Amino acid sequence: MGQTLSEPVVEKTSEKGEDDRLIYGVSAMQGWRISMEDAHTAELNLPPPDNDTKTHPDRLSFFGVFDGHGGDKVALFAGENIHNIVFKQESFKSGDYAQGLKDGFLATDRAILNDPKYEEEVSGCTACVTLIAGNKLYVANAGDSRSVLGIKGRAKPLSNDHKPQLETEKNRITAAGGFVDFGRVNGNLALSRAIGDFEFKKSAELSPENQIVTAFPDVEVHELTEEDEFLVIACDGIWDCQSSQAVVEFVRRGIAAKQDLDKICENMMDNCLASNSETGGVGCDNMTMVIIGFLHGKTKEEWYDEIAKRVANGDGPCAPPEYAEFRGPGVHHNYEDSDSGYDVDADSGGKFSLAGSRGRIIFLGDGTEVLTGSDDTEMFDNADEDKDLASQVPKSSGKTDAKEETEAKPAPEAESSKPADGSEKKQDEKTPEESKKD
């Protein structure tokens, strides 16, 4: 079981912004964990590389979520620097944004590896980002954070969760000399792509893309239409608890109620937060969530009105009205979400609440979103986790699942996180050797 506090840290760090193209909100919460290891970036309007407006005629926006494990150092570095590093890539400067994102992820990895300040660093992080250029979204992902597009209330994931048991990931891992055991890379790391985690990137004979764990991202390009309402980027602290479709419907209800996007993020995190930390699993993780709304030439008020009108007319699925209520941390809603229409929820039967079905929800590379059968008491137990993976995943997918966990390993000392009043939370009586990092 991972280390948890006697009470969750429910204070949230939130921000919002807008221009004539986009509106966004973001929020982050430490929750039950003893420290905050998530980071994020939200850049509404970035100048083009070298101020070259001929090659880059569209305004550029960049948003990302970085879920750390083993410490916060790599996640913080990525959140503060990855967009600048991406913009410096020659491929990006030439206008090839997809390749620029791929090159930028690997360059971020190299920058950390080559910085003497991080010489002994053992932590890593996911990276799920979106670049918005004109009417195109470029989503780059390494790890199991996720981007999901809301299309008139229907969820369309724009990233795949990189889990070691996926066939393509397992093939790379084994070809590089690693193995997958209990759903983990070398029996340790339960995601197969990440920035950092350099202990899995030591083969001098292999390219960065072919290491046991790689920072090389998948990139999805999507051309926006009037039906595309918003994009959600979040860490697995959200996706462990809710299906992609459930999140989209929740966000849509908040928009219909004219709530600010950062407040919708806060409400979602409160809804995901576990009522207690006895299990230390689902609902006990750090949580970070970004919502980006696409105005399509409308004002912010017109955008809100348009979505509210669609909801009132039954134009696409939406959560019930009570989901716009702010009930406070750990007070859960419960209802069956809708079929997204994008073949991501057929096997999950995803519930909107921790009070409903329990277990880890993952989006697999074959387009299937799976709700595992595990009770969250197993999520932080290395001995028991994934012992019945074959029964948890539909046979047609041929894939399995594991909650992202790493074996306990020493990490550089980081500043401790405290609540706003400066008081410290009492930790459960667990030693680091008895705990695993998320």
Swiss-Prot record:
InterPro entries on file: PP2C, PP2C_BS, PPM-type-like_dom_sf, PPM-type_phosphatase-like_dom
Transmembrane domains' residue ranges: none
EC numbers, comma separated: 3.1.3.16
GO molecular function, one term: protein serine/threonine phosphatase activity
Subcellular localization(s) per the UniProt record: Cytoplasm; Nucleus
UniProt entry keywords in alphabetical sequence: Cytoplasm, Hydrolase, Magnesium, Manganese, Metal-binding, Nucleus, Protein phosphatase
Bias-annotated ranges (Basic and acidic residues): 398-438
Region entry Disordered, spans: 370-438
UniProt GO cellular component terms: cytoplasm; nucleus
Cofactor-binding details, from the entry: Binds 2 magnesium or manganese ions per subunit.
Binding site for Mn(2+) 1: D67, G68
Functional note: Dephosphorylating regulator for many key proteins. Negatively regulates the endoplasmic reticulum unfolded protein response.
The protein's name: Protein phosphatase 2C homolog 2
